[in-house]
Amino acid sequence: MAEDNTPQCSFCGKEKSEVKQLIAADDANICNECIELCTDLIADSDEHGDDDSDIDTSWVNKKLPTPKELRAKLDEYVIGQDAAKKALAVAVYNHYKRLKVSQILANDSKKAKIGADDAMVELAKSNILLIGPTGSGKTLLAQTLARLLDVPFAMADATTLTEAGYVGEDVENIVQKLLQASDYDVSKAEQGIIYIDEIDKISKKGDNPSITRDVSGEGVQQALLKLIEGTVAAIPPHGGRKHPQQELIQVDTSNILIIVGGAFAGLDKVIQQRTEKTGIGFNADVSSKDDSRRSSELLQQVEPEDLIKFGLIPELIGRLPVLAALTELDEDALVQILTEPKNALVKQYKYLFDMEGADITFTKEALDAIAKKAMARKTGARGLRSIVENALLETMYELPSMKDAKTVLVDEQVINEGKTPEIA
């Protein structure tokens, strides 16, 4: 196996000693054999016109952000969750690098140019499971990654899914949402990201057999298997229903990155039972004042066997090789979320009030009070907007009708006691 510092082609993986020439650039290397392959592909395209137009090469020339660059961009929008950001950045980078290589190798007749078929390494898809409490940033991380990579994004709630043939959404509806997000461009949809939330809510009901079919639990997990590992989904055009004699849109999910997430309430207890048996866990129950910190520490130790015990089927866990646990946000992190990200809530309200010709200011005590309320409600970052919206409702109602209002001051009393903000 080559050492990490051995120069090698970024596309075929061959070392410098295995090729005639290796051309180095800032972000990648390419060997003479890959250059010849690309030259032949272009020549074939010129010679045969549109014969190869169905070969997608959208990622071949696109610059792929490195894991460090992805992480730095995530830092601009998401506060904390360093371990999860790192795991996501690496998984997403490897996924789209795999897609880039597969597009170069799309023309079967050219594979021999860069190595025999039996020497080629097939790169498996690294789908991701995010574990973390409500409002910790799971959805935001997935959305932000899709925006940074400029790929279509679709989100689904696992609790609304049922097996095909039952009332509710089936798994193909998720692919339909992605197709809609890509304006029915199949090629774009096949390179997108799907985020499935509340995956923990479809855990199996138990090991005991039941006379009633579990159509929204284990049944949905089974239905998700093919979507996650790769299948060709037949989607009716423009969101209609399937019917006979209808021409369906074929969407291959093999290159769609699947991210699933859930709060997994109670998983920390499952992990605690396992780790205590081996003498490395926590002896106290997770119920004291710092229970959220202990719970987060336990979730960092999650293993596939814990998820199986929780109720996910082994086949599903096997298709989600990247596990990332998010921690519950504390008050300091919530205050940072209010003020620091590019799209921070305080910045959004400042922009709204600027449009009315007024400058809004939140005191430090007001920000602390907002964070405390969100902590008390156990809604995490998701509950911040609701608290601010309620506090500013009356002001936002009156302000557009006021001609001489220049400043709005939000202090602790506005948040805690419902006092109207001071307008001057």
Swiss-Prot record:
InterPro entries: AAA+_ATPase (IPR003593), ATP-dep_Clp_protease_ClpX (IPR050052), ATPase_AAA_core (IPR003959), Clp_ATPase_C (IPR019489), Clp_protease_ATP-bd_su_ClpX (IPR004487), ClpX_bact (IPR046425), P-loop_NTPase (IPR027417), Znf_CppX_C4 (IPR010603). GO terms for cellular component: HslUV protease complex. GO terms for molecular function: ATP binding; ATP hydrolysis activity; ATP-dependent protein folding chaperone; protein dimerization activity; unfolded protein binding; zinc ion binding. Coiled coil: none annotated. The keyword Chaperone applies. SMART domains: AAA, ClpB_D2-small, zf-C4_ClpX. Keywords: ATP-binding, Chaperone, Metal-binding, Nucleotide-binding, Zinc. Residues 1-50 form the ClpX-type ZB domain. Zn(2+) binds at residues 9, 12, 31, 34. It holds the Pfam family AAA_2. ATP binds at residues 133-140. One of its GO terms (biological process) is proteolysis involved in protein catabolic process. It comes from the Bacteria. Belongs to the ClpX chaperone family. PANTHER family: ATP-DEPENDENT CLP PROTEASE ATP-BINDING SUBUNIT CLPX-LIKE, MITOCHONDRIAL, ATP-DEPENDENT CLP PROTEASE ATP-BINDING SUBUNIT CLPX-LIKE, MITOCHONDRIAL-RELATED. HAMAP family: ClpX. Component of the ClpX-ClpP complex. Forms a hexameric ring that, in the presence of ATP, binds to fourteen ClpP subunits assembled into a disk-like structure with a central cavity, resembling the structure of eukaryotic proteasomes. ATP-dependent specificity component of the Clp protease. It directs the protease to specific substrates. Can perform chaperone functions in the absence of ClpP. This is ATP-dependent Clp protease ATP-binding subunit ClpX. It comes from Psychrobacter cryohalolentis (strain ATCC BAA-1226 / DSM 17306 / VKM B-2378 / K5).
